[in-house]
Amino acid sequence: MQARQRRRAMEARMRIAMLSNREREVLDRLTQGCSNKVIARDLDISPRTVEIHRGNMMEKLGARHAAEAVRLQLEASLVDWLH
């Protein structure tokens, strides 16, 4: 079971590595439960720009919902924990 989890975590990390820095910042804040409005304020960008980054991020990750993107982020963080 742990080998399978490690593989999934590595796959998630590889997918997240394809994101731009700004897309990763948006994903980090989504993972923290922030709304687009809060993300926009924190990053000093417009809510529309957050939507664009979020859409690009989800397309690159192959995520249909924000929850899938957050799950990938959490799985990617398991790599260090599983070693």
Predicted regions and their residues:
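Residues within the DNA-recognition helix of helix-turn-helix
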Residues: D42, H53-N56
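Helix-turn-helix DNA-binding segment
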Residues: M10-T49
